């Protein structure tokens, strides 16, 4: 299932659906879910996947009332996000909490999918995002996120290779790339 972002960030959708009313059950409960997907078609598909697992209702016996893409209110500021997830690996089910810094919730979740694929070889359709929440700077737990909260943060000079134009491709001396 193409849950992963193919080059771009995932979008955040709020999908609202319910079981189709019947004579036996004229008033049915409404379910609302926050889904991260590349487009609205995949968001609907993931909605029915989760509803069939949680409420035992198939797509044939249900209907989607609304689907809306959610946009970040102020995407210009960097925030800390905590992501609670569960995923299935070759050995079993795992629960996990991860932290990311990003400007949007969808960007943080995209980072999470890519990070889980890289570190744990978890496939995108086996990852279930349970909750995403902004985390205050003093409440962050991970050292990789805490190091960016220093006001006097300094970044090292990068290890650059300068491209000189009028030089031959092959040379007898190795170039110096350390500029410290």
Swiss-Prot record:
This is Large ribosomal subunit protein eL20. GO terms for biological process: cytoplasmic translation. One of its GO terms (molecular function) is structural constituent of ribosome. GO terms for cellular component: cytosolic large ribosomal subunit. The gene is rpl-18A. Keywords: Ribonucleoprotein, Ribosomal protein. The keyword Ribosomal protein applies. HAMAP family: Ribosomal_eL20. InterPro entries: Ribosomal_eL20, Ribosomal_eL20_dom, Ribosomal_eL20_eukaryotes. Belongs to the eukaryotic ribosomal protein eL20 family.
